[in-house]
Amino acid sequence: MSLSVEAKAKIVSEFGRGTNDSGSTEVQVALLTAQINHLQGHFAEHKKDHHSRRGLLRMVSQRRKLLDYLKRKDVARYTALIERLGLRR
């Protein structure tokens, strides 16, 4: 269910400020988005997996909180991230 190490490293290098920047808000949102997209494919096949669906809702909520924080702190970074990830907000 989780992302591979290579996929995480690619996301960190793409969205982070450095190679080891895994804690910035942009990287956290990008990692959550990748995991959410992966789980949506899982639910197309396993419709009754309610245990994992709860985890998905938790991830969506966490991503929303991080995006709200970024919007409060720096609107320019927020809009750039939304554009890069293709989110609807």
Curated annotation (Swiss-Prot):
The keyword Membrane does not apply. GO terms for cellular component: cytosolic small ribosomal subunit. Keywords: Ribonucleoprotein, Ribosomal protein, RNA-binding, rRNA-binding. GO terms for biological process: translation. SUPFAM superfamilies: S15/NS1 RNA-binding domain. Signal peptide: none annotated. One of its GO terms (molecular function) is rRNA binding. It comes from the Bacteria. NCBIfam families: S15_bact (TIGR00952). Part of the 30S ribosomal subunit. Forms a bridge to the 50S subunit in the 70S ribosome, contacting the 23S rRNA. PANTHER family: RIBOSOMAL PROTEIN S15, BACTERIAL AND ORGANELLAR (PTHR23321), SMALL RIBOSOMAL SUBUNIT PROTEIN US15M (PTHR23321:SF26). Belongs to the universal ribosomal protein uS15 family. HAMAP family: Ribosomal_uS15_B. One of the primary rRNA binding proteins, it binds directly to 16S rRNA where it helps nucleate assembly of the platform of the 30S subunit by binding and bridging several RNA helices of the 16S rRNA. This is Small ribosomal subunit protein uS15. It comes from Citrobacter koseri (strain ATCC BAA-895 / CDC 4225-83 / SGSC4696).
